[in-house]
């Protein structure tokens, strides 16, 4: 089911978490934040909306590292009911797409609920103080649209890196609903 994300709640603090990567390595929010901020992306392996953006997402995340913005991806789906999203498949997906950031599994779905995530992909861009500054889409080329790419998330997070604030105007992300237990 297609869902749009809510608007950005500017200044909302990032909820703390500690989750395991697909290979059982543990990460906490405090370990992940970069000098200028953190991009938290709720994604999964099977959603066609994620598949359509994953290449640009990974490239943008890599470029943002040079600006002091780190990235973490979190898989929130019930992988028992949706085995394509299980931790083993997450590892394969991360390797296939050359993730340069942790891909964590939210077994209890509590982190997704704490953040207010509703779909995959769902992006949360935080400044260095872990205050929400971006809750929008990756770019204008959702689901393979043609045309010149406008990297909205990248541009927003570059603004966050330089000013600490996100853009006032943001366009909601859309994607597959999170598969709740």
Region spans (language model):
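Chalcogenol-based redox active-site neighborhoods
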Residues: 1-170, 176-181
